[in-house]
Amino acid sequence: MKIQLTQQIIINNKHRWYSMLDELCFKSKNLYNYALYQIRQYYKNTNKHLTYYELNALLAKKNQIDYRSLPYAQCSQQILRQIDKQYISFYNTLKSPKMKGKKIRLPKYKDKENGRNIVTYTNQCFKLKNNVLSLKINNNNKIDIDTDLNVQIVRIIHKGNHIVIELIYNKEYELKCDNKQYAAIDLGLNNLVTLTSNVCQSVIYDGKKLKNINHFYNKRKALLQSKLNGNKKTSNRIKRISYRRNNKIKDYMHKVSHLIVKYMKTNNLNTLFVGKNSGWKEGINMGKTNNQNFVAIPYNLLINMLDYKCKLFGIKMIILNEAYTSKCSFIDNEKICKHKTYYGKRIKRGLYESKHGHKLNADVNGSFNIMRLGIQKCNCDALNVVPTDKRYVYNPVRIKINI
């Protein structure tokens, strides 16, 4: 089996490549706006959609200047495909019963001066020889990137004060056989990840530093916004601290996901169950501070990182609905569903008490319940959900992440 991965190269605005890549993204924006105008006018006059194939033939025949300004015809065609997808999505939204009576906007033009658009190179548009990828930018310039990857697609994405070059490549992976050794994770705030297993020590990966990053960012952003003049919503300084904050969070998530996969590999755990609720950030009411922290933490980013890293090591990852896993008692083997009264309860913050008075970490209880759900769903014949050593249940190890 194959998995598609991406390697990113960050080009800041002082790099020697920045100006020519910026110009390339500007030309891409020009073609984007021109093609969008053609589709809008065609729809206005005929009430029909101008398809990608019709638009591509039209611009090629006219030898349109924006179409020809990009290094390769395939680069221009990728922009036309981008717009075509947006319009198909727009038409599908119009037909959706859920959107009836709601205002649906057409795809917008990009700003004439400050707008930039993505540039995509297929593997027909670059040379990869002796671990050097040569990328033509214009008639006079090219850039050489050292890489040992079998790159299939290159994307150049303008991000304001920096540009990202994405190298997209495929990698083979093979899932290991079920060895009846499982792990499950429960996601939270102070305890970002609580990992439990039926054969080894429970582990809690700290999330307090992640909260600190968000707290500092929100405080700093509010101060800078209070100094803005008129109707301005952002500034270069706000963009800069947002960029740094996003990079810190991404780095933190990479470190946590790496430690989880490394722990699973070391302990020969071949299956990971992840608890998640769809729409768990919508309409949530945990108080102002907790809402701010919970909504700001990108749990989906962590789950996606875990997904591809698990595949690279042959670990099977299964996402489950974690509803009622925190309320039901794992120790009492309580059925995981809604009850009028539950066997156990939280007696204080972070501490869960079972029916017979056993006390354990509340997140550990939730994580073990997620494992129970996973074993039931997959019809796994686990020897035992509870580890033989009870210290693995009652004494989880806390791991702090260095940033």
Annotate each predicted stretch with a short phrase.
Residues 53-159, 292, 296:
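Acidic carboxylate diad motif detector
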Residues 7-11, 141-147, 203-206:
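Generic detection of short hydrophobic beta-strand segments and adjacent strand-loop junctions
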Residues 1-76:
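Gly/serine-rich nucleotide phosphate-binding loop at the start of the catalytic core
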Residues 35, 75-90, 362-374:
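Stable alpha-helical structural segments in soluble proteins, enriched in small hydrophobic residues
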Residues 28, 80-87, 238-246:
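Short amphipathic alpha-helical coiled-coil/interface segments
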Residues 5, 161-403:
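Positively charged, helix-rich recognition surfaces that bind polyanionic ligands
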Residues 20, 24-27, 75, 79, ...:
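Short amphipathic alpha-helical segments
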Residues 36-43, 87, 91-98, 171:
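Long, hydrophobic, amphipathic alpha-helical segments used as structural scaffolds
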